[in-house]
A protein has these predicted regions:
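Cytoplasmic helix-loop-helix junction between adjacent transmembrane helices
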Residues: 89-124
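A late C-terminal transmembrane helix in Major Facilitator Superfamily
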Residues: 308-343, 350
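Helix-loop-helix hairpin linking two adjacent transmembrane segments in secondary transporters
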Residues: 82, 113-114, 120-171
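Residue-level signature of mid-helix packing/kink "hotspots" within the transmembrane helices
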Residues: 12, 40-48, 131, 234-242, ...
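C-terminal transmembrane helical hairpin of 12-TM major facilitator-type secondary transporters
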Residues: 254-297
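Extracytoplasmic gate region of multi-pass secondary transporters
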Residues: 15, 189-241
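Conserved MFS/SLC helix-loop-helix module at the cytosolic interface between two early adjacent transmembrane helices
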Residues: 45-83
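Helix-to-loop junctions at the C-terminal end of transmembrane segments
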Residues: 46-58, 240-253
Length: 372
């Protein structure tokens, strides 16, 4: 779980500082969106290699190596060079992308009989790391005198801790069957439904998390207030990520629960765009959606797969394609804001991602296992 706690802070911590980074480096919204999108893009680009790495070195050593790469990527952000900032973000994304794929396979292997609970705990830890990063990044930055580079690198201390705690796991090596998605998997409608579901919820989560602080700053709030609201939303995602998969796991068919989650997220977007009041509530509802949905996506991978090997393959497929699609979000929404001058238009466009997510849920949440 300490490893899972490291899979979001390096990404989420950029958003509360994006205004400071833009001012310091002279970025526009589109380029800043590219900076926030780069790790998500490399989540997807590195995902197909994760099953092969786990087959070659074992899950335990693969995670250990990914943590080393994560720490190296965060260190690159300290180098006073714009190129290193972007390269470091890409390296961070590649490391996290590998862990994103192999950890659900670990849940399938070791906790198949408690998949709902363990998926919820895993997702809660992901969201918890994001919430802590969202809430503490600005106070850390202020304590460090407004040095955003040092602030970003400081989150590497958590990764160093996880690295040392993981060392005892290296005494055992569990290899999984190699390969990425097979041809039959690529033709399987359930696998594609999980992929679309994963991509849609990731698009909403990372794009909303990336631009919410700037949206709030432009609305007249301070950086500290924006950080608190984002952290509150992330905390709601944490609760949703823990509770919803446990509830959904009680039924063989998860369609009703999943559509209810998507509806709450849609209500949050409507409220945020239609009134200036109750902003924190609307943010909480929006973040409830992807917070629960990432848990549901991981649960679908476990429940719909006939074996640990297939879980790893589905995870690799869903995350490689899904995260590449999601990476477009921060850039697209930043560009739409620059073109229209309106956050309402840009955020409204983001809310449309809930439509394909809802359609995909009708297939992914059914009580049917993949037949390959």
């Amino acid at each position: 779980m300490l490893v899972a706690a490291n899979l979001r802070p390096a990404v989420v911590s950029v958003a509360p500082l994006v205004d400071e980074i833009m001012a310091d480096l002279g970025f526009g919204s589109a380029l800043a969106g590219m900076l926030t999108a780069l790790p998500v893009l490399f989540f997807g680009l590195s995902a197909p290699f994760a099953p092969k790495l786990a087959a070659r070195f074992g899950i335990e050593r693969t995670v250990f190596g990914a943590l080393i790469v994560l720490i190296a990527g965060m260190g690159l952000r300290f180098v006073p060079d714009v190129a290193c900032l972007f390269v470091g973000s890409a390296v961070i994304g590649a490391a996290i992308g590998v862990c994103n794929v192999v950890l659900p396979a670990l849940v399938k292997r070791d906790f198949a009989h408690r998949s709902g609970l363990m998926t919820g705990l895993y997702s809660m830890t992901l969201s918890g790391g994001a919430a802590v990063a969202a809430g503490l990044t600005v106070p850390i930055d202020q304590r460090l005198g407004g040095d955003w580079q040092v602030t970003l690198v400081s989150w590497g201390l958590l990764a160093v801790l996880a690295l040392f705690v993981w060392i005892p796991q290296l005494s055992t090596t569990h290899r999984v069957v190699a390969s990425g998605p097979s041809g039959s998997l690529l033709r399987n409608p359930i696998a594609w439904a999980i992929t679309v579901f994963m991509g849609s919820q990731s698009l909403v989560f990372y794009t909303f998390s990336a631009w919410l602080p700037q949206y709030l700053l432009d609305d007249g709030r301070s950086a500290a207030q924006a950080g608190v609201i984002l952290a509150t939303g992330q905390a709601m995602a944490l609760v949703a990520g823990l509770v919803i998969p446990i509830v959904a796991g009680r039924w063989a068919d998860q369609r009703l629960v999943t559509l209810a989650v998507i509806s709450l997220c849609a209500a949050g977007f409507v409220g945020l765009l239609s009134t200036d009041h109750l902003t924190t509530l609307w943010v909480m509802l929006v973040m409830f959606g992807p917070g629960a949905s990432i848990s549901l996506a991981l649960l679908f991978m476990v429940l719909r797969s006939p074996s640990t090997a297939v879980t790893g393959q589905v995870s690799g497929m869903a995350q490689s394609i899904g995260y590449v699609v999601a990476a477009v979000g921060p850039i697209l929404i930043g560009g739409l804001h620059d073109l229209s001058g309106s956050w309402s238009f840009a955020m409204g466009a983001l809310g449309l991602a809930l439509i394909p997510q809802g359609v995909a849920a009708l297939w992914a949440a059914r009580d049917v296992k993949m037949v390959l």
